[in-house]
A protein has these predicted regions:
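Active-site anion-handling motifs in enzyme catalytic cores
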Residues: 1-267
Length: 267
C-alpha cells in the first residue's frame, strides 16, 4: 500500500479536470492506497468525490502532505501550458521540485502538454518532466512537445483518465431538449485566443444557427462556471436567447447523465 498525493486543477469548478480526478479514483479503487489531493476546495472534493483535500495554494500544508506521501501523482489534464498564464507551469514545477527535494517519487499520467509559447514555460516544463520518475501522455502531440522542449526520456502513451469513469445510470426523469422530433447536440465551449473568445463566440453562434436550421437542437453545456459563463451567454444572446443551456452541474457524473439525453456532442 502506498500513500499518494494527487496534483492537478481539481476542486476548482472545472468539471473536465474533476472528471480526470474521479476517473483516476475509480480506476485505482480497491488497490489499498491512501489518497489525498491538492485542490481548490477541500470541502467540495470530500463531499463530491470522497477524498481528503489539501488547499493547493497553502504551501505549508502542501509541504506537510508531501512529507507524508510516497509519491506525487499528476493524474492528467493540460496543466503544463502557458496559454492562460505562466503561473500554471511555475506552480506545478514548484510542486515537482518540492517532492524531489524530499526524495519522493513523481508520476506524470495522462498529461496533455502545451501550448508552451514562452521560454520560461518551456524551460520549467522540461525541468519538471525530466525530474519525474514516470511520464505518460494522452496524445502524440504532447509527446512531440516534450521532445521539442528538451525532455530526455521516452514518454508512454495512454488514454485520458476520464475514460475510467463508470457509465452513468440513465434517469428517466431528466429533461429532453429536442422538440418536434429534433435531435439534440450538446455544445461545450471555452474562451480561447488573444481575442478573449470573440472568435469562439462568433463561430459557435453561427454553428448553433446552422444546427437549428437543419433540424438539430443545440444545447450549451457549462463545464466551468468561472470560464464558460460569459461565452455561453454571448452565444445565446447572438441567437436571441433561444439556445437552451445546462448550468450549475455539480460533478462529472451530472454531465454524463445529461449527455445520455443527447445524440451528439461538439466541444
Amino acid at each position: 500500500m502506498a500513500n499518494l498525493l494527487l496534483a492537478g486543477y481539481f476542486g476548482c469548478g472545472n468539471l473536465g479536470d474533476d472528471a480526470i480526478l474521479l476517473g483516476f479514483l475509480n480506476g485505482i479503487a480497491g488497490k489499498g492506497h491512501e489518497i489525498q489531493t491538492l485542490c481548490g476546495s477541500p470541502d467540495r472534493v470530500m463531499n463530491a468525490y470522497g477524498v481528503r483535500g489539501i488547499p493547493r495554494l497553502d504551501f505549508n500544508e502542501v509541504g506537510r502532505a508531501l512529507d507524508d506521501t510516497d509519491a506525487l501523482v499528476f493524474p492528467g489534464g493540460s496543466i503544463f501550458q502557458d496559454i492562460t498564464s505562466m503561473r500554471s507551469v511555475a506552480y506545478y514545477y514548484k510542486l515537482v521540485a518540492m517532492a524531489k527535494k524530499r526524495g519522493k517519487k513523481v508520476v506524470m499520467l495522462g498529461q496533455g502538454v502545451g501550448p508552451l509559447n514562452g521560454m520560461i514555460g518551456r524551460t520549467l516544463s522540461a525541468k519538471a518532466f525530466n525530474l519525474a520518475d514516470a511520464v505518460v501522455v494522452r496524445d502524440p502531440g504532447s509527446s512531440d512537445t516534450l521532445r521539442k522542449i528538451g525532455y530526455k526520456g521516452m514518454p508512454r502513451l495512454a488514454a485520458d483518465a476520464a475514460f475510467l469513469l463508470p457509465a452513468p445510470q440513465v434517469e428517466e426523469d431528466l429533461p429532453r431538449f429536442g422538440v418536434a422530433g429534433m435531435k439534440t447536440v450538446g455544445i461545450s465551449v471555452r474562451p480561447f485566443g488573444k481575442d478573449k473568445g470573440k472568435a469562439v463566440i462568433e463561430t459557435f453562434a453561427e454553428l448553433t444557427r446552422i444546427l437549428f436550421s437543419n433540424g438539430w437542437m443545440p444545447v450549451l453545456i457549462e463545464m466551468d462556471s468561472a470560464m464558460d459563463k460569459s461565452v455561453i451567454s454571448a452565444i445565446g444572446k447572438a441567437n436571441g436567447g433561444k439556445v437552451p443551456e445546462i448550468k450549475n452541474l455539480q460533478s462529472p457524473i451530472d454531465v454524463q447523465k445529461r449527455m445520455t439525453r443527447m445524440d451528439a456532442v461538439i466541444a
